[in-house]
Amino acid sequence: MQENLIKVKDYIKNNWTRTIRKKDYKKDFTMPYDYISPCADGHLTELYYWDTYFTNKGVYIDNLENYALNNILDLQYALKKFGCVPNMCRKDGAEYSSQPPLLFLMVNDYYQKSKDVEFLKESYTLLEKEYNFWMTKRVSNNGLNHYCTNHD
């Protein structure tokens, strides 16, 4: 079992570079920073919201904090553009479902690693914007939050 875990970890570590997408990778929605997509090959080449939380956990383990920061800054860019962090970052991404709000955890994780107070201050307003989105656009009649599409 331990040997298999080591193989998986080595595979991931050796393939991070295959998942890096250049900021202009998708022509329909250009991200300001290079980012890590969930797949090296295949159709999942956009920046996906909650996948990025777990991706960032992995890049921290492998000491690639700069990619975690890029991912966060790209999600913050999408939040500014769409008013929410969409499921996937592409031109029509805000039409798709939102996902659980994990941006605050990503910001906290990065801050815990970097101790970058300016980053934290700059992120605060955007985190407040995401909070307000969830408290006004993603709250049910019973007061609980839920994720859905803008058409629900």
List each model region and its residues.
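Acidic, mature catalytic/reactive cores of soluble proteins
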Residues: M1-D152
